[in-house]
Amino acid sequence: MTTISAKAVSELRKSTGAGMMDCKKALEESGGDLDGAMDYLRKKGQKVAAKRADREASEGVVAAVVEGNKGLLLSLGCETDFVAKNEAFIELTNTIAKMAFDADCKTIDDVNALEIDGTTVKERLVNETGKVGEKIEVTNLEVVEGENLASYIHAGAKIGVLVSYKDGAKDDADQFFRGVSMHIAAMKPSILHPNEFDEEFVQKETEALQAQINAENELNEKENLGKPMKNVPQFASRRQLTPEVLAATEEAIKEELKAEGKPEKIWDKIVPGKLERFIADNTLLDQERCLLSQFYALDDTKTVEAAIKEFHPEAEVVAFKRISVN
């Protein structure tokens, strides 16, 4: 049996990053040949990767790279938080993110095809899978370009956000839009404005919301829970609130005030508030999924859109991306 020296094991570990016992086993199997040992470890990684192909790489970390007018978010996935917290795993994530940024990658396939240490990223991750015994893969890639960019990585590097914005020429715009990025991390909007919704999607979500509230009200009544009955909204998105709908609603409010005997001279003070309430009650889908329609996490007395306009009338979010693991 070939005697394996500590020096040979150390050299193989340095070249591959594999564990000491794995390196020793590989050298024994290859009769002490370094190239043969590396091939052994590579094949071992392929076998482990094949066995774990159907596993979910639902843990991991997110890295952000922002330079000039471009920003990139990339997440590297693994199976457990234990591996995700490993310094080598975090360093590899940051390395791949910077490579993807420099190579102007647009898709995960682009990233996997990049060359790293004499092999491709995809092959490197197969080798990493063999080393740690967990599926490892690039799970998300997003690129945002714009004149001004803000980024935010949430504690633990589980969530990353990029925001492209117009600053209104204010010096503290970076700080303000970092706050908007933090809001996006916490509140998970999927689109910027209600107009981005598909009409059919909005209709289905409206019907689902109405059914949900009706079911909750029926349960409340049946079980005598004593909770206040919820109003069932006619609509769910600002996209549905056409000028005709708003005009009809305003007229209905005035008729209601007239029936209540409220003097007409004070209607102008009451109608705007009631109309605003109607809009809030009938845009629940927007409040859940549209950034500009959500109540601002850093000041929930106003929407994100209102907070931005209060910061500066010409400031605006142009685009944003949010990625997360687990």
From Swiss-Prot:
The keyword Heme does not apply. It comes from Rhodopirellula baltica (strain DSM 10527 / NCIMB 13988 / SH1). It holds the Pfam family EF_TS. This is Elongation factor Ts. Its main location: cytoplasm. Keywords: Cytoplasm, Elongation factor, Protein biosynthesis. Residues 80-83 are annotated as: Involved in Mg(2+) ion dislocation from EF-Tu. Disulfide bonds: none annotated. One of its GO terms (biological process) is translational elongation. Associates with the EF-Tu.GDP complex and induces the exchange of GDP to GTP. It remains bound to the aminoacyl-tRNA.EF-Tu.GTP complex up to the GTP hydrolysis stage on the ribosome. Gene3D superfamilies: 1.10.286.20, DNA helicase RuvA subunit, C-terminal domain, Elongation factor Ts, dimerisation domain. GO terms for molecular function: translation elongation factor activity.
